[in-house]
Amino acid sequence: MSILKQASLWLAGLLLLTGCGFTPKGQVINRADINSVYLSTPDPYGQLTREVEQQLRFAKIDILRHPDEHMVQLRVGSEQQSKRTISLYDNGQSAEYELGYGVQYQIIQPGKEPLSFTINIHRDFLENPQQALASSREAELILNEMREHAARRIIRRLTTLEP
């Protein structure tokens, strides 16, 4: 009886999760049915470009190397980074920063008006002046996380467009 009850609960939970459209983190479902896209970026070898390409591969979307007017085009603009002091120590040194990351991009579908979007991400960062090297490494890791998050948001928007 207990095994049957436990199996029923698992089945009910599974049906509930699949019924509401739940997908594991990082998994991209291509609802727009896009098979290939032309990717244009200011820095073809930059970190953001690599992140976007990786997310396109996860979504099983081929990347075209030459523009085609009959295919979807993804034009990613340059990255903007900012650093703003939020709080200070007693001696006047910065204690906490707000790191900002932004990128603009455009999705061009054949026969439709281009769609322009902006992504802005902000994270707080505590500065420890006694561990300057560790603090700069942590800031770099936070920037990479924001870049990865932006790439996921770009591809999520691309894969949920109306055909």
Where do the PLM segments sit?
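Short, low-complexity, disordered segments immediately C-terminal to signal peptides
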Residues: 27-32
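C-terminal/domain-edge helix-coil "capping" segments
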Residues: 133-163
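Bacterial N-terminal signal peptides that target proteins for export
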Residues: 1-9
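N-terminal segment of the mature soluble domain
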Residues: 33-80
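Bacterial signal peptide processing site
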Residues: 21-23
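Sec/Tat-exported extracytoplasmic proteins
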Residues: 56, 60, 107-111, 129, ...
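C-terminal motif of bacterial Sec signal peptides marking the signal peptidase cleavage site
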Residues: 17-19
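Surface-exposed short loop/turn segments
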Residues: 75-118, 124-140
